Amino acid sequence: MLETRCKYYKNEAMFHGFIPHIMGTRFDILLIHSDIDRLNTLWADIAYELERLDKILNRFDPHSEVSKMNNHASQSKIQISKELKSILQLCSYYYQTTSHLFDITLKDFSRIQLHEHSYISFTSPDISLDFGGFAKGYALKKIRKFIEQENISDAFANFGNSSILGIGHHPYGDCWKVSFLNPYNQSLLKEFDLQDTALSTSGNTLQYTGHIMNPLTGIFNEQRKASSILSPDPLEAEVLSTVWMIANEQEQKKISEKFNNIQATLYNL
């Protein structure tokens, strides 16, 4: 059962929901509204949705849908859920629009074969799917819809300080302020003022280096660099923050022309 916690701060009309372990990280959300019952219901819906998505996309869970697909799709056609089919179609779109730098197979997305009636197969036995650079952005997009449906105008959702959505503003400010720190020395790289905007960051750290691979070359990026993407779309921000770590200047320019609402920055650490 998913572990969740929550607390309501009456003076600020602020609800804090917390999940210590989901999608490989922690999740926090702040919801600003005076109706505590409404916020409790919304929080329950969000927590349920995150658990549901994790059961689809978490490749480390042997019972998840993606794990079952990874184990069998290279052997024969298997049927997948309509949502996973839709997700794969989204991934195909980002594969094409990022010059093949976004690739959930880390090898060759074209080896995924989608068939009629939501069946899928892999044309190579060594293909498996990893939604690590997709799932949190996809989840934030879903969460935003829940918040909008409840007509809540101020909220802040945060996956592990790397995938963030700011809606409206903080109770004591005109935006949601987020500091992006250098992971090697904790100095300030940039401060963002989020207002109806998503932020995604990516990069190497002292403890976590060489985890980002260029699918076109098979080479892991071990440079002391980090990236940040601002976008109205949380999923675009998530996808492109990883892409920016491996794209060269020419590729970045080409991709920027297709995503003209983003603000992308690459940092030397």
Descriptions of predicted regions:
Residues 1-269:
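Mature catalytic core of soluble alpha/beta enzymes
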